[in-house]
Amino acid sequence: MLERFFYYLLPTTYYLFIKHMALPRIKIAKDKAELVQRLLDEKRTTGMFSTYADVIAFAASLGVKHQRRSPVTEVSQSEPAPISLEVFISRGYERLIRLIAVVSTEDIKVLSSEAESAEAAILIFEEYANGGLEKLQQELRGAVDYTDRLVLILNAERFSQ
């Protein structure tokens, strides 16, 4: 599946990635690292997501929904460190990354086989994820149990439409 994704999305850089195994990494802002950790359901804590990739994908979707796009200025180097694109691909988020890029730019060229287009799509995804994490920080401030608060947020979103 990984090889098919790279061939489909990045045919000209496909062999470069496979040859050097230098897959791009999705960066997380240093000031959001603690929030991302707390959203992870590790040993039945306050989180409800299985992986960091799930947290970031949800945050990116939330960022798009609320039109919040914020650049990652300082990258977290500790837990969670930047996440390999391979993790997102294995979880099925490659389409989400491409969809967000196309919707954001309103230009199908972002799906081209050029390496710059792939980097642009990843950058857009990171920025929306950071914006979504900012929104989550505001919404979850003071919450003891993130699961209950996230359910309330999702229900409010559902009924507000």
Predicted regions and their residues:
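Short, basic amphipathic alpha-helical segments that act as recognition/interaction helices
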Residues: 48-74
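Charged, low-complexity intrinsically disordered terminal regions and linker tails
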Residues: 2-42, 57, 69-161
